[in-house]
């Protein structure tokens, strides 16, 4: 998933626009964008929307961000949305693999009741929203086959830390949040799942969004969350491998295929080893996922 677009569950017009935005995934939000008095209504709206949307042809993936376990609202969220068959839930304020295991068990019970195959609904965890979570980023590996991605957030973490800001005057994240970002990336790599970058909140600043997205791709992230449809084309463009990148990756793979058993190969006077091969395969996989013909 290159782009994952947040939409409040109680806003039908925005949900419809999100489906046509070009985003790889739409995150139907039951958490931060929904006030306490609107949670019950938002659950029902989310379930009705997803029930219809999953039948659409060529649709984006459909995720639901539920409320965190500590709120006491997660069970009611899952009761409402699991029968609608979303592709995944987004688990906020996750504190390590134990919370993913807990979510897995809750999903299994509800899938059985709804007549869904066990494991049908995947999990994307937000791995850095509490101070405790930072120390547990390495515990996601092996937690559940449902886990398909880790992402991170700075807003809740900055509130917990008591910080006055999470970005500097140039819009770049300050050190505590750079740490959270790095831990999310490493945790995702250890768990062999997608690493998804956090949102850029200034959705009108396309240049800053492109810079931040290019830095995320450079460092190993595979996608980025969005809060406005206008951000989707930029994110998709950055995370879609260029023709030159595809050609270079194909050359590396072809060179190793032509020299089975070798740990290094030479291409135009440059030496490539096994890590280069792995990166080349990742580029080709991302191209395929983006719909490119390879």
Predicted regions and their residues:
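Expand to "…catalyze enediolate/carbanion chemistry for C-C bond making/breaking, isomerization
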Residues: 1-294
């Amino acid at each position: 998933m290159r782009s994952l677009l947040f939409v409040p569950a109680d806003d039908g017009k925005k949900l419809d626009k999100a489906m046509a935005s070009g985003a790889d995934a739409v995150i139907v939000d039951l958490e931060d964008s929904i006030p306490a008095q609107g949670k019950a209504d938002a659950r029902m709206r989310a379930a009705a929307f997803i029930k219809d949307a999953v039948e659409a042809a060529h649709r984006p993936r459909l995720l639901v961000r539920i409320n965190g376990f500590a709120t006491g609202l997660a069970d009611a969220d899952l009761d409402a949305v699991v029968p609608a068959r979303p592709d995944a839930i987004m688990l906020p304020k996750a504190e390590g693999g134990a919370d993913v295991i807990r979510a897995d068990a809750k999903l299994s019970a509800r899938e059985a009741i709804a007549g869904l195959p066990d494991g049908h609904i995947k999990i994307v965890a937000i791995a850095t929203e509490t101070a405790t979570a930072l120390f547990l980023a390495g515990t996601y590996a092996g937690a559940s086959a449902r886990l398909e991605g880790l992402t991170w957030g700075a807003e809740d973490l900055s509130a917990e830390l008591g910080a006055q800001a999470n970005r500097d005057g140039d819009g770049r994240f300050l050190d505590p949040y750079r740490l959270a970002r790095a831990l999310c990336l490493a945790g995702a790599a250890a768990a062999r799942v997608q690493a998804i970058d956090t949102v850029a909140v200034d959705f009108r600043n396309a240049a800053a969004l492109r810079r931040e997205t290019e830095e995320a791709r450079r460092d190993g992230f595979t996608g980025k969350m969005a809060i406005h449809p206008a951000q989707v084309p930029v994110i998709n463009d950055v995370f879609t491998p260029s023709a030159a990148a595809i050609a270079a990756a194909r050359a590396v793979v072809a060179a190793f295929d032509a020299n089975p058993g070798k740990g290094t190969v030479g291409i135009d006077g440059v030496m490539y080893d096994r890590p280069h091969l792995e990166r080349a395969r990742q580029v080709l996989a991302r191209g395929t996922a983006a719909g490119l013909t390879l």
